[in-house]
Amino acid sequence: LGDSLGLSQEAGKTDARIIVFCGVHFMAETAAIISPDKKILIPALGAGCSLAESITGYELREWKKANPDGIIVSYVNTTAEVKAWTDICCTSANALKVVQSIPPDRKILFVPDKNLGAWIRKVTGREMELWHGDCCVHERITTDMILEKSRDYPQADILIHPESHCSHDEAILNLPQAYMYSTAGMIRHASRSDKKQFIIA
């Protein structure tokens, strides 16, 4: 049990030669990249992800042609083809540090998650070109939904993933009980907190 990269890393640590990856296609690809000597099986070959499917390697190649000095930063939730055209691959946990490490005179294309990119841009003030991709589930999590749940459960901590539509809205970010986390960070917070209720965005 874990997030996409965490599961792929666990696959790399095990002595098993065959890994059955119960997830979407890009996750199994990532496991295969990390463990090229192992056989990675996915039960449903057609299991897709709207975020990963929002961009292709061809589109990145064309951007690179037009911006030869630009830096492509891709979220780990991408296909192997997209990773191949990527300069730096990041996770939601280290995306801020990755963007901050790039010289200010270099143009950045952040792909494919527009919400994660918008949150990074808001926090760092760094101008970036954002791809217009999203997770179809996270995109439906709006500020109004979270504020309503917060009124219903006033004692609950709000744990926000930067993929969520509400992740770069001041109305949420300014709440004292709101925390921005990767999936693994959410799990850690919930396990260590004295709170009994959590709103997950």
Task: Enumerate the language-model features and the residues they cover.
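Active-site loop-to-helix "anion-binding N-cap" substructures in soluble metabolic enzymes
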Residues: L1-A201
